[in-house]
């Protein structure tokens, strides 16, 4: 299967084979479930879901919504589904602080600080049979990142304090292409979608040279770590961002 081959190639020997098998075999059904939940993806003139390419892929297999607003659309659809389920309680404007543990040492909930008009102001707790830490990245520990303002690594810290083992923390992804402003700008920076290159855009250096040619067989659509490394090399050579 080409999708599996592409994933393993981009993983450079670091992939969990079982996880890759789950990704490529269950991915299409997961997309169908998202559509059933109300997610709307961009379509071609024929009415089929429009697919494009991103780094590391040899085929067009990336679907999108509203151009480059795919994440927002998926979040919208899932949040609407959650709000429509009377069996789920949503606590908004809440900062999870620490994991709660039972007398036996098992995690059984979290302490949280809820702030905002109309909310339960102050420190409280939420009990649960299972706690899933899904807090996103930690890019905001760096002065410049394409990660949103909420990507502060709080979830990783919470897990560490609870005694969980954290793996692969060195794999902090920096998106290769960002709209440069200047060094005075801190925090979240404007991301230039990889799909732009998937539709034919090319990367040029200060000399208008297509510098990814010869660096990787897929050139501008090489895996992100390869593209990011070569962009960094070009910056070092030119002394320019």
Regions found by a protein language model. Give the residues of each.
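Glycine-rich active-site loop/strand segments that organize a redox cofactor
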Residues: 1-23
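Generic structural signal for well-ordered, non-membrane alpha-helical segments
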Residues: 16-31, 67-75, 124, 148, ...
């Amino acid at each position: 299967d080409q999708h599996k081959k592409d994933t393993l190639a981009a993983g450079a020997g670091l992939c969990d084979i079982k996880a890759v098998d789950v990704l490529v075999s269950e991915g299409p059904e997961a997309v169908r479930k998202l559509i059933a939940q109300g997610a709307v993806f961009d379509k071609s003139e024929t009415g089929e879901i429009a697919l494009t390419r991103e780094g590391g892929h040899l085929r067009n297999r990336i679907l999108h919504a509203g151009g480059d607003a795919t994440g927002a659309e998926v979040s919208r659809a899932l949040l609407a589904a959650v709000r429509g389920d009377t069996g789920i309680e949503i606590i908004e404007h809440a900062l999870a602080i620490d994991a709660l543990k039972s007398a036996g040492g098992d995690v059984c909930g979290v302490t949280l600080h809820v702030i905002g008009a109309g909310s339960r102001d102050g420190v409280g707790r939420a009990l649960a049979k299972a706690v899933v830490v899904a807090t996103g990245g930690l890019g905001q520990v760096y002065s410049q990142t394409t990660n949103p303002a909420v990507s502060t690594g709080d979830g990783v810290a919470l897990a560490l304090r609870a005694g969980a083992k954290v793996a692969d923390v060195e794999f902090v992804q920096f998106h290769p292409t960002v709209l440069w402003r200047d060094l005075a700008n801190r925090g979240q920076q404007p991301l230039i979608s990889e799909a732009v290159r998937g539709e034919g855009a090319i990367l040029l250096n200060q000399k208008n040279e297509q510098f990814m040619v010869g660096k990787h067989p897929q050139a501008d659509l090489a895996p992100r770590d390869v593209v990011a490394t070569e962009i960094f090399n070009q910056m070092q050579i030119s002394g320019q961002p």
